[in-house]
Amino acid sequence: MKHVKWIFVVLLISSLTSFVEKDKPTGGLNVGDIATDFKIKTMSTEQQPIQNLSKMKGKYVLLSFWASYDAQSRMQNASLSNALHSTSPNNNVEMVSVSFDEYQSIFEETIRKDQIVTPTCFVETKGESSGIFKKYRLGRGFTNYLLDDNGVIIAKNISAAELSAYLN
């Protein structure tokens, strides 16, 4: 009878611990990693025809990935853009904003409504199947990265308040 109790206790403990959620890696690149280079082509004639991340070495870069269907990433992108442009036009940070909307028209309407003024705002119409999405191992939550002048990630998922503090 004692063995049955011990077996029951062991089974109970093992079943309880199996329901505890383990820490999962958060995916994407991390602070200290070198940002993966990419090229993105814009469909708008008003913007640069191609943006190449490696050409921005020597500048600090705020790299923001978002989509209009993801309210949190959209709001974060707009607040980062506003924080960047309201602090000082001569700051040393350039923003590269990449949307994963599958339709150019939705992207353009979102940019207009959110009043994003960055000339380096691009859309990747392949969405989650794009090379950039895969290179950066992005998930549904999207993310942003602050890169130093050598392309090394110095902050991940930075808020507008943190960006403003950095710029001041």
List PLM regions with ranges.
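A short beta-strand-turn-helix
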Residues: K39-V61
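Aromatic-flanked redox-active Cys/Sec active sites in thiol-based oxidoreductases
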Residues: S64-D70
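Residue-level signal for well-ordered, solvent-exposed loop/turn and beta-edge residues enriched
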Residues: D33, E46-Q48, V152
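Structural microenvironment flanking redox-active thiols in thiol-disulfide oxidoreductases
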Residues: R74-D114, E128-I132
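Hydrophobic beta-strand anchors of alpha/beta hydrolase catalytic cores
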Residues: L62-L63, M95, N144
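Short, internal strand/loop/helix patches
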Residues: E108-Y145, D149
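Thiol-/selenol-based redox modules, centered on thioredoxin-like
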Residues: R140-N168
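N-terminal targeting signals for export/organelle localization
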Residues: M1-K39, A165
